Amino acid sequence: MNAWEQRKFGELAEYKKGPFGSTITKSMFVPKSDESVKVYEQQNAINKDSSLERYFLPKEYAYTKLKAFEVHSGDIIVSCAGTIGEIYEIPDNAEYGVINQALMRVRVDEKIVDKRMFIIAFSNMINEFTRTHSNGSAIKNIPPFADLKPMKVLMPSMEEQKVISECFEKMDYLITLHHRKLICVKNALKFTQNDIIREKL
């Protein structure tokens, strides 16, 4: 096995926090249309669902004022306020949009780190930060870039990263498969119980 290399989070990805609150206000929102752009919110990261939507901005405003905050498939969004550290990768079929002030966009440098490995390492880092800085109360904001980027993590070679990533992917598949089977069994049990009760009546 190759030696693991120490890396800084600032080397592994490009990070962009959402715009200042005054850049996106409710007075700017418009109904969804061909001339609007979706605003991604914390609910998308927390619920791991890109289809959730509430607010839209005029396309011209988003393209001219919020270009730096746009979100594409493959980008990672992270919740930054309140419920912090929820991580979600935007899927291939997701709608184009921009992030609001409560999110951070992460673009992983996949030449040096596998995206799944990054997500695991980043999530662990946030959990450790929360644990060591909570002082008995909830952490309400993600670490500032000045603290986040210098944080160090051990990373294996890309070859080993891919092997580890594939292993986790298979485990996720099995968990999902067994979860679906469990739901089917529970539904069958409920149906049987109801059927027995009806017969007794």
Where are these regions (language model features)?
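DNA target-recognition patches
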Residues: 10-16, 26-61, 106
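A short beta-sheet element
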Residues: 39-43, 57-123
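Structural detector for helix-capping/boundary residues
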Residues: 7-12, 43, 101, 195
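A short glycine-rich beta-alpha junction/loop motif
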Residues: 31-32, 80, 96-104, 136-159
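Non-catalytic DNA-recognition/assembly elements of restriction-modification systems
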Residues: 1-22
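Amphipathic alpha-helical segments with low aromatic content
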Residues: 1-7, 150-151, 157-201
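Glycine- and charge-enriched low-complexity intrinsically disordered segments
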Residues: 117-136
